[in-house]
């Protein structure tokens, strides 16, 4: 169940089930905690001195019926070392608080940590990110669970200390986009097919003024010459779709265009994946899910810009008609591609989608894809990989990610890597060999974005958590939404 958010800043007298305040490792209290301490005759200070209240990072202490405090509960969240308290510590504190309260009987709470000073961040940022982080922590997947396992208990309403209504609304919009993306990513592949992704896009656009959807089927894609995308789709009974979503909030200005890889399940094709990886391949559409989530955020925030989202939705499966290693296919651009590996399919659907996207004459073109395991090996789960030949665009995206702690790290896209994609039988080979796999994948895409202000985000390491119980993260909806907020502010 999604949280309801409001603004409030009368801490000691707030009419809520619980007040959320903070304490540092040295027992220093946040301003709201100091007010409660004074109202209760020094109760918080006494508990801290006795060791019954911890300010260590990750610690939460739930107190009941403090004298002089109207709320029946006070949750004290440990903030760690005061000198090191910054963006990641703040976001962790939000999550710690929400998880602690979701497990109990508290239905409403006031979160006061948004009033704590954070270096290089303002009050609007604190409110906006508190909403996003709280909603992320409260998320529970229930779509395919039995009725008895649905989650409607615990915290339902969270007031954020502050008075910036715009920041609250933006936070709610971005949180909705993140949740939308996570829900799509978490759905099993027999639910989330290419046709389902198309239906979801049409439904959302139909419910919001200024948004529209266009869906291309395989016959329309064939007429456009999308031979690369259609080659990947040949082996599946779930036929492909090209999902195109448009938001018109910026008059006649050129749109920002996001392209997201939408492989709804990736068997690897003839180059079949093995156990130990294939069971997580429902997440191979998270690039598509996350650009749709960013679209949701932009529409709900009513951003004053134009946005186009393009998602090639395809299942990479195997039957007698599946494409093979050594096939030569013709892309929409006219370039021919020799298939070296059918498990390097993401770039084959993206190249046609990127070519199609250029008809919108984008102000900037950004693709998002769970493209390579090589990027995950290089960067782990902490950051996405970013590639671009346009320093200004790369710097905008890097700054947006750093601002909201949804970070990316730039990798080179030098011409010296391009010969690794040479083919004897076609214009380009779809793999680059053993080395620099993330970079050569970016180089492949660069051949289909010439003349465009373009960047590539490889999100293989950040799109989902590891393991059997891992879930879609919604990254980088935060980065992309902040980037669009920045563009709207400059307009």
From Swiss-Prot:
Highest taxon listed in the record's lineage: Bacteria
Keyword Cell membrane: no
GO molecular function, one term: manganese ion binding
Sequence positions that bind Mn(2+) 2: 261, 266, 284, 345
Signal peptide residues on this chain, from the entry's feature table: none
Binding site for Mn(2+) 1: 266, 343, 345
Catalytic residues, chain numbering: 273, 347
Reaction(s) catalysed (UniProt annotation): Release of an N-terminal amino acid, Xaa-|-Yaa-, in which Xaa is preferably Leu, but may be other amino acids including Pro although not Arg or Lys, and Yaa may be Pro. Amino acid amides and methyl esters are also readily hydrolyzed, but rates on arylamides are exceedingly low; Release of an N-terminal amino acid, preferentially leucine, but not glutamic or aspartic acids
Subcellular location: Cytoplasm
InterPro entries, per the entry: Leucine_aapep/pepB, Macro_dom-like, Peptidase_M17_C, Peptidase_M17_leu_NH2_pept, Peptidase_M17_N
Function of the protein: Presumably involved in the processing and regular turnover of intracellular proteins. Catalyzes the removal of unsubstituted N-terminal amino acids from various peptides.
Protein name: Probable cytosol aminopeptidase
Species the sequence originates in: Stenotrophomonas maltophilia (strain K279a)
Gene: pepA
